[in-house]
């Protein structure tokens, strides 16, 4: 089934997404390590919601900054030097 093959292919590489809030830019930038935009936005939303519960999923801008990061970083977020993966993405923060 072609769709299944595409889904598997889609999940081969973990990417780093630079995420920010359109409505609350003062919240700054979060790097989310995920397979796709949807997961990245959800991760970033979780971080932003700790500071401002009004941040909405649809209000999060995400763009790929790195296309192939170690799989161990999947589902993690990074926004300061204490986080895993910081050395990979510090230039984007």
Where are these regions (language model features)?
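Small side chains
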Residues: 16-19, 32, 44
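Short, mixed-charge low-complexity intrinsically disordered segments
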Residues: 46-93
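A short, exposed loop/beta-hairpin motif centered on an aromatic-Gly-Thr core
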Residues: 26-35
